[in-house]
């Protein structure tokens, strides 16, 4: 084996950055000279201001390209009525959030900062602390949510009360600029990050595509589609693969080359991206409740690998696509321009359009009467909820289980009212509630049977598909799971939630148990008391008859199913085993 001469390959060779930025300030930045070279001097205040503004902007606004993709759904004749309904709610939500009061999503995320510091940039040290201060200022001063829990020991936790710590990863590079990518990453989409350890045997055209489609199916709808999906094949290590997944889902690597070389440069496979996007459209899951728009786009990146390893990574950026670039150069501090007027994407005819027909449900009456009313309607039925709802999520359910395990029984409020899986952002002055959208239902699946056996949690409201144990529990105990659109948290806070108060465990912050009063709160029957599961009906390869039955009910509901060749593709491509 002959030795090759040394050659350094930039592992991620990107083309020129064409991102549009605005100038935040030219203060706190100066130019000096050292040993004949110009040095960019950056004061700590510059880093704090940059992080503060970037996370503020990303919490209330999204990229124009993302908003355009959402708007395109409204004009697509192949989009289902559900796709269009969800897209319209996203645009309305963005229009409210862009005012800077109610954030786009109630889960205002973990603050993640990736920084690349040029060798001729001097800060004097303490960069992480200065950036963390900016994150702190954003979450303290804006109406955001504190989602970070600190471990006191292996089992006891406490909310940090600031949303710190942030994840800050800084790298040294050439040049005289300091460049950043800031990500506000919610738990729902973060939890849809996966690593699979495979082998060379996977790397054939027939096997790889089918493999990636199978993995894509497992994402489900819990992380608020339409998604920006990223696949990464290869990597010098597992962690290198997953870091690339995260950045690819944020469009950070869009300017990579489209072919590889013998030195191991990363590249995008554009053709495979197109093929996978078509497969995503044919899954039938759509924008949360059935349709075409499971994904806006897909990125596939190929990396070099060790001969004994073939890591495959998958991740998503959700409908709250909160990614924003920033940079510091000799001219000042620059922040990526996000869309400040998302209302312009809403067609005039839809600006004041009503919400269509829905079954009105009065929640301020005995639970038995509410259950009796819901039992009259099939899965997919659209509802308008009015009255009292209990709000609780992960820790609240753990607390309730502890009570049951001690033989204490359940509090009456969990028996008398539906429970909404959610945790509110801070309430702005003059508002009844902060942004308050649903969290992922599946994390509470293990509690359902025990709760319902004691008369609690008979009606659950959240987002995403659920496991068979929930369907079985609802059939056994006469319960229901209702779906709420994941994403439009500002719309719900402004239009549907009229009062919010803490019922129990105030020390848990957003994880406390709350009570809300709602008007015209939209929901859909997803699992009923007869063992029917809406997602099972649209996903099963054996459910042609069920699809026809549900389609016949579409007059007053939100779901429209497909006919002809598109329906055949949907049925062929969605075996039930892929979803359970």
Curated annotation (Swiss-Prot):
Pathway noted in the entry: Carbohydrate metabolism; tricarboxylic acid cycle; (S)-malate from fumarate: step 1/1
GO CC annotations on file: cytosol
Keyword Cytoplasm: no
GO molecular function, one term: 4 iron, 4 sulfur cluster binding
GO biological process: tricarboxylic acid cycle
Keywords: 4Fe-4S, Iron, Iron-sulfur, Isomerase, Lyase, Metal-binding, Tricarboxylic acid cycle
Domain of life: Bacteria
Reported induction: Is expressed under aerobic conditions. Is repressed by glucose and anaerobiosis.
Co-factor(s): [4Fe-4S] cluster
Cofactor binding mode and count: Binds 1 [4Fe-4S] cluster per subunit.
Chain sites annotated for binding [4Fe-4S] cluster: 105, 224, 318
EC number assigned by the record: 4.2.1.2, 5.3.2.2
Catalytic activity: (S)-malate = fumarate + H2O; oxaloacetate = enol-oxaloacetate
Subunit field text: Homodimer.
Function: Catalyzes the reversible hydration of fumarate to (S)-malate. Functions as an aerobic enzyme in the direction of malate formation as part of the citric acid cycle. Accounts for about 80% of the fumarase activity when the bacteria grow aerobically. To a lesser extent, also displays D-tartrate dehydratase activity in vitro, but is not able to convert (R)-malate, L-tartrate or meso-tartrate. Can also catalyze the isomerization of enol- to keto-oxaloacetate.
Membership in a protein family: Belongs to the class-I fumarase family.
Protein's UniProt name: Fumarate hydratase class I, aerobic
């Amino acid at each position: 084996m002959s030795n090759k001469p040394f050659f350094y390959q930039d592992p991620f060779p990107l083309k020129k950055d064409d991102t549009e930025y605005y100038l935040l300030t030219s203060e706190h930045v100066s130019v000096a000279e050292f040993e004949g070279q110009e040095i960019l001097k950056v004061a700590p205040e510059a880093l704090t201001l940059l992080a503060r503004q970037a996370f503020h902007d990303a919490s209330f606004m999204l990229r124009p390209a993302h908003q355009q993709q959402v708007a395109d759904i409204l004009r697509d004749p192949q989009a289902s009525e559900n796709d269009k309904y969800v897209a319209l709610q996203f645009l309305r939500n963005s229009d409210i959030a862009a005012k800077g009061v109610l954030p786009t999503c109630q889960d205002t995320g973990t603050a993640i900062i990736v920084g690349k510091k040029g060798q001729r940039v001097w800060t004097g040290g303490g960069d992480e602390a200065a950036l963390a201060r900016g994150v702190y200022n954003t979450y303290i001063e804006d109406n955001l949510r504190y989602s970070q829990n600190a471990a006191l020991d292996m089992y006891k936790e406490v909310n940090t009360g600031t949303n710190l710590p942030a994840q800050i990863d800084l790298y040294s590079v050439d040049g005289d600029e300091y460049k950043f990518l800031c990500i506000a990453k919610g738990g729902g989409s973060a939890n849809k990050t996966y690593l699979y350890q495979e082998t060379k045997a996977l790397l054939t055209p027939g096997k790889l595509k089918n493999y990636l489609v199978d993995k894509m199916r497992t994402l489900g709808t819990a992380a608020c589609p339409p998604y920006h999906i990223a696949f990464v094949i290869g990597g010098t290590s597992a962690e290198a693969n997953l870091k690339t997944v995260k950045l690819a889902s944020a469009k950070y690597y869009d300017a990579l080359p489209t072919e590889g070389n013998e030195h191991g440069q990363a590249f995008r496979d554009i053709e495979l991206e197109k093929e996978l996007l078509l497969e995503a459209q044919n899954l039938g899951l759509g924008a949360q409740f059935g349709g075409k728009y499971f994904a806006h786009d897909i990125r596939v990146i190929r990396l070099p690998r060790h001969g004994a390893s073939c890591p495959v990574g998958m991740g998503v950026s959700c409908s709250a696509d909160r990614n924003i670039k920033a940079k510091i150069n000799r001219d000042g501090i620059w922040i990526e321009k996000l869309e400040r007027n998302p209302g312009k994407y809403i067609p005039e005819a839809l600006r004041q359009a009503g919400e269509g027909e829905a079954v009105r449900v009065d929640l301020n009456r005995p639970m038995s009467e509410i259950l009796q009313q819901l039992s009259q309607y099939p899965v997919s039925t659209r509802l308008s909820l009015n009255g009292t709802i209990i709000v609780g999520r992960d820790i609240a359910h753990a607390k309730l289980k502890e009570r049951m395990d001690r033989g204490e029984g359940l509090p009456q409020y969990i028996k008398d009212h539906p429970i909404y899986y959610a945790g509110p952002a801070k309430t702005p002055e003059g508002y009844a509630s902060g942004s308050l959208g649903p969290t992922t239902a599946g994390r509470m699946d293990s509690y359902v049977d025990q709760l319902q056996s004691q008369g609690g949690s008979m009606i659950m409201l959240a987002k995403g598909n659920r496991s068979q144990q929930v369907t079985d529990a609802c059939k056994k105990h006469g319960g229901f799971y209702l779906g709420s659109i994941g994403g439009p948290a500002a719309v719900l806070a402004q239009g549907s939630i009229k009062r919010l108060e803490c019922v129990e465990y105030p020390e848990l912050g957003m994880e406390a148990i709350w009570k809300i009063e709602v008007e015209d709160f939209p929901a859909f029957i997803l699992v009923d008391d007869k063992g029917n599961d809406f997602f099972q009906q649209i996903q099963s390869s054996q459910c042609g008859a069920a699809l026809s039955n549900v389609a016949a009910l579409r007059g007053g509901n939100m779901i429209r199913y497909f006919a002809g060749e598109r329906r055949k593709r949907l049925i062929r491509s969605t075996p039930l085993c892929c979803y359970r």
